[in-house]
């Protein structure tokens, strides 16, 4: 299959992975019924294909009112009660988004079949996966998954928690939240403070606190976990005063609250773009919001599709200050955390999706200065920093392949690695932090990706959810199966005890001043001081050089 044919499917992989299971008919527990604060819900008995493992699934449970009409661009409100027994056997609507990024024919070619899921603003639902033996009083650990997708795409039903729930005896909850403009648009004032998607996540966590006991979960043992923008969400909840007490552990996979593209102190740029695209010639925020609430779904979707990525904002409530300030001031209540990255975050999928016009494979020593100058501007750095980036990452090498590899490393460091290390350093003095670098290149990608790609963005998700046991006919090795089982065990141990270690697993040391971390590969091992030189460059050397540059420019102006 040519690489371009795989783009749609890999877009889905970047935000998550579809792990479908087979529904089976049966007696009694085949139609489990559970209570919630707003009514009863009926689920399904599900067997993971080719195993005797059974789980109960409850799909499409509302945790808030539909965010439509006057509730568009407003905080979520508690769901309305219902009478009778609600059907929880079909997937909920996914939130309004550019569904072209979710893949189509390419999924079928890989024997991956997306369920036919409709799209609607009425999308604030969650899915629950519970071991079939669980009942009220089982007090199982709860793992709440927040999907990624640049805060613009994704859905809960791409992630099937059945294998993780059944093999590790945990309750898995996958939640949805408003995306794109509908989820994160802000006017910067009281008329639309923004972060609606984050507020949806808070509402879902409150629902879990109130109701998960009826599904066999322990509300006092909740771990939130997510990847990419989902990891950013998790990290943002750690520092948000609105989320305190709603969870007790946090797992951040390739995403933290200070990712440069997913947090902004100002909403001005997005505000201006939306105002122009909408045709709402508003003289003030109040009239703009009135106009936007009057748009239909198709009109809002057209605006949404302009944004491949959209940032959360400092809104004064969910995020009283920039996350970096909140961490530096210790103005938060940290919980034990697993934080990690993959060793090739900008290897292939992200440049393919986010910046297809930039042909990394065309970089040479001759073209590099212009490329780095442009890249520095995109990073919100002075263009003169291009020379510093060249010196740090490329040195004097002339070899194009080496230059291209170093460029990809530089982008991955800036976007994911350095922010993750910064957050780990902030948090480790207040609560245990376990850091990892995922290093395994999945074998089933060997025919679809360039050979230089290692562990790309999103690759670990397959293993976290036990991909090889789902209804997926992809080749995998025995070693990969063992690695998947180890990762699920680490994650579930952490959810259960706040510590990933247990007998039979390679030891994972806490990240302290020795800077130890786990190298997650077929043969896991302990590393030390991950990217110490690069961390020094991005957090000390580069800021100092920028200050010197500004000082020089100021003196030049005075002359």
From Swiss-Prot:
Pyrrolidone carboxylic acid: modified positions: 27
Keyword check for Hydrolase: yes
Keyword terms of this UniProt record: Disulfide bond, Endoplasmic reticulum, Glycoprotein, Hydrolase, Microsome, Phosphoprotein, Pyrrolidone carboxylic acid, Serine esterase, Signal
UniProt-annotated catalytic positions: 228 (acyl-ester intermediate), 345 (charge relay system), 457 (charge relay system)
Span of the signal peptide: 1-26
Subcellular location: Microsome
Record PTM Phosphoserine, positions in chain: 552
UniProt xrefs under Gene3D superfamilies: alpha/beta hydrolase
PROSITE patterns: CARBOXYLESTERASE_B_1, CARBOXYLESTERASE_B_2
Protein's name according to its UniProt entry: Pyrethroid hydrolase Ces2e
Encoding gene (name): Ces2e
């Amino acid at each position: 299959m040519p690489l371009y044919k795989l783009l749609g499917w890999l877009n889905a992989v970047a935000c998550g992975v579809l792990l479908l299971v087979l529904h089976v008919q049966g007696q009694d527990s085949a139609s489990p019924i559970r209570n919630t604060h707003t009514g009863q819900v009926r689920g399904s008995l599900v067997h993971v294909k080719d195993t005797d493992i059974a789980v109960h699934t409850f799909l499409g449970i509302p945790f808030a009112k539909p965010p439509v009409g006057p509730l568009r661009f407003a905080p979520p409100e508690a769901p309305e009660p219902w009478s009778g027994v609600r059907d929880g056997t079909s997937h909920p609507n996914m939130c309004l988004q550019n569904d072209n990024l979710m893949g189509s024919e390419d999924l079928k070619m890989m024997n991956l079949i997306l369920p036919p899921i409709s799209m609607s603003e009425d999308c604030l639902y969650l899915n629950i996966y519970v071991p079939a033996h669980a009942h009220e009083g089982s007090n199982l650990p709860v793992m709440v998954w927040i999907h990624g997708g640049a805060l613009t795409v994704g859905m809960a039903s791409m992630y099937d928690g059945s294998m993780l729930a059944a093999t590790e005896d945990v309750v898995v909850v996958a939640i949805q939240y408003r995306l794109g403009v509908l989820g994160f648009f802000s006017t910067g004032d009281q008329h639309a403070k923004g972060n609606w998607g984050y507020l949806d996540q808070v509402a879902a966590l409150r629902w879990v606190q109130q109701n998960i006991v009826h599904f066999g979960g322990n509300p006092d043992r909740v771990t939130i976990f997510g990847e990419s923008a989902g990891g950013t969400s998790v990290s943002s909840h750690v520092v948000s005063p609105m989320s305190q007490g709603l969870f007790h552990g946090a797992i951040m996979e390739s995403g933290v609250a200070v990712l440069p593209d997913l947090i902004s102190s100002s909403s001005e740029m997005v505000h201006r773009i939306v105002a122009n695209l909408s045709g709402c010639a508003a003289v003030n925020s109040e009239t703009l919001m009135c106009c936007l609430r009057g748009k239909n779904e198709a009109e809002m979707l057209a605006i949404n599709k302009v944004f491949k990525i959209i940032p959360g904002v400092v809104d004064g409530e969910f995020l009283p200050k920039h996350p970096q300030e909140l961490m530096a001031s210790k103005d938060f209540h940290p919980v034990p955390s697993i934080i990690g990255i993959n060793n090739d975050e900008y290897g292939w999928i992200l440049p393919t999706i986010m910046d297809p016009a930039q042909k990394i494979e065309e970089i040479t020593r001759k073209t590099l200065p212009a490329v780095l100058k442009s890249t520095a501007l995109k990073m919100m750095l002075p263009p003169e920093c291009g020379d510093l980036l060249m010196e740090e990452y490329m040195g004097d090498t002339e070899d194009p392949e080496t230059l291209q590899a170093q460029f990809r490393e530089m982008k991955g460091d800036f976007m994911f690695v350095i922010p993750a290390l910064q957050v780990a350093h902030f948090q480790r003095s207040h609560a245990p932090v376990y850091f990892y670098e995922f290093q395994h290149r999945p074998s089933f990608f060997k025919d679809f990706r360039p050979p230089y790609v290692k562990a790309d963005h999103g690759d670990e998700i397959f293993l976290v959810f036990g991909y090889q046991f789902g209804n997926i006919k992809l080749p995998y090795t025995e070693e990969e199966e063992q690695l998947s089982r180890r990762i699920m065990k680490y994650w579930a141990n952490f959810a259960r005890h706040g510590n990933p270690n247990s007998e039979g697993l390679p030891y994972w040391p806490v990240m302290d001043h020795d800077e130890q971390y786990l190298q997650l590969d077929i043969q896991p091992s302990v590393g030390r001081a991950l990217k110490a030189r690069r961390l020094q460059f991005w957090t000390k050397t580069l800021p100092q050089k920028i200050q010197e540059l500004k000082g020089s420019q100021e003196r030049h102006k005075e002359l």
